[in-house]
Amino acid sequence: MFKSGFVTIVGRPNVGKSTLLNYIMGEKLSIVSNKPQTTRNNIQTILTGDDYQIVFVDTPGIHKPKHKLGEYMVNSAKDSTNDVDLVLFLTNPDEEIGKGDKFILESLKDKKCPVYLVLNKIDESTPERVAKSLEMYSSEFNFKEIVPIAAIKGKNVDTLVDLMKTELPEGPKYYPEDMITDVPERFVVSEIVREKALRCLRDEVPHGIAVDIIQMKQSDNGTYHIEVDLICEKDSHKGIIIGKNGQMLKKIGETSRYELERFLRTKVNVKIWVKVRKEWRDNQNLLKELGYKKK
């Protein structure tokens, strides 16, 4: 009997949703950064075994939106919990239950599918803190399963996947077995560049960064030639991104190229230009151009 179903991962920003998904898949498909709100789109990734297929929906973290992009991210996360077979609520033991957690859990109470509590980053906590966190969350919601994990190290992740398989109904193979994501290759490329920009810039530039792939061509010898616009909101941000004598932009380009070559499995030439688009996160037309469709 073949089993298949949809699993969505929800939680506050920066609790490790993308890290968990990337570990399960063994591929870097969802942007990972130490900054919150780095996942901006619902990304479906597909894990296929001999007798099962799990379609994961990786979502933006749910938070109080401050601009139209934020509204898109929150609505995207809420929509992802509809018509799924299992919800994984991901959180960390070293953080108290906040308004954001209660907001998410309240929105899940009407769901007919089972909800798991997945307590991530237990390797960074203490047994006492983990136990207290389990007690707190159990008093807020009737979880079907509680699974402590360390996603970055893979601890207990196999156990979590095995439990997920038990929730799958009998069903078809929704995607070909060699397909691991439903997003276009260009999208993954743009996410890689955005992640490297966030990592290189650290706290120097806030989240007002977007990536627009201007050109992506593959030559006869297999080399990809990629041209990218890195979009920011202020002229002062542009100067920071470029850096002294262009050193910061060079660093972003070099780290992006390395990761792109790993993903595309071939040589890559990447050129990055920095463009200022003031208040782009509140510009509905520009958001559409960048792939953030209004919900």
Swiss-Prot record:
NCBIfam families: era (TIGR00436), PRK00089.1 (NF000908), small_GTP (TIGR00231). InterPro entries: G_ERA_dom, GTP-bd, GTPase_Era-like, KH_dom-like_a/b, KH_dom_type_2, KH_sf_prok-type, P-loop_NTPase, Small_GTP-bd. GTP binds at residues 11-18, 58-62, 120-123. Belongs to the TRAFAC class TrmE-Era-EngA-EngB-Septin-like GTPase superfamily. Era GTPase family. The keyword Plastid does not apply. One of its GO terms (molecular function) is ribosomal small subunit binding. Residues 201-278 form the KH type-2 domain. It comes from the Bacteria. It is a peripheral membrane protein. GO terms for cellular component: cytosol; plasma membrane. Residues 3-170 form the Era-type G domain. This is GTPase Era. Residues 37-41 are annotated as: G2. Keywords: Cell membrane, Cytoplasm, GTP-binding, Membrane, Nucleotide-binding, Ribosome biogenesis, RNA-binding, rRNA-binding. Residues 120-123 are annotated as: G4. Residues 149-151 are annotated as: G5. An essential GTPase that binds both GDP and GTP, with rapid nucleotide exchange. Plays a role in 16S rRNA processing and 30S ribosomal subunit biogenesis and possibly also in cell cycle regulation and energy metabolism. Coiled coil: none annotated. Pfam families: KH_2, MMR_HSR1.
